[in-house]
Design a protein with these regions (language model features):
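Eukaryotic scaffold repeat domains enriched in small/polar residues
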Residues: 1-136
Length: 136
């Protein structure tokens, strides 16, 4: 172990159910702090840089083409996309009719983006599916 940081709590550098981690091209460590409804950002030594609180239970992040993609698990659910500096680019959610296998948009658990920009989201709970979103 080279270094560790954080403890349970609600302040900067404290966490409530860490859910995913990503390191961007500038070596910033981006962490989904799910139960605190935020994304916390640190330098690679663990020094707190900032937090983004305009999220609902962030479950996973993915970085592609200088954009940060986040799948959210809260009551609004959905996907948010920001620039690396934290400017919101897009946000959407989806609600299906609740039929088995259709998903709800609330249970997003994982996210990735392919080379053509299509976004894949895994859903847990009633949906239990993989959803693919493409630009139109």
């Amino acid at each position: 172990l080279l270094h560790s940081w954080g403890k349970q709590g609600t302040g900067p550098g404290e966490f409530a159910l860490l859910h995913n981690i990503w390191v961007d091209k500038d070596s910033r460590v981006i962490i989904c702090d799910r139960e605190n409804d935020r994304i916390q950002i640190f330098d690679d030594s663990g020094n707190f840089l900032e937090e983004w609180t305009d999220v609902s239970k962030p479950g996973d992040v993915w970085i592609s083409n200088d954009l940060i993609y986040c799948v959210e698990q809260g009551t609004e659910g959905g996907v948010s996309i920001w620039t690396l500096s934290g400017d919101l680019v897009s946000r959407w959610s989806w609600k299906d009719d609740g039929s088995p296998g259709k998903g709800s948009g609330y249970g997003g658990h994982g996210i990735t983006v392919d080379s053509s920009g299509s976004i894949y989201v895994t859903e847990i709970g009633d949906g239990e599916r993989v959803a693919k979103f493409t630009r139109v």
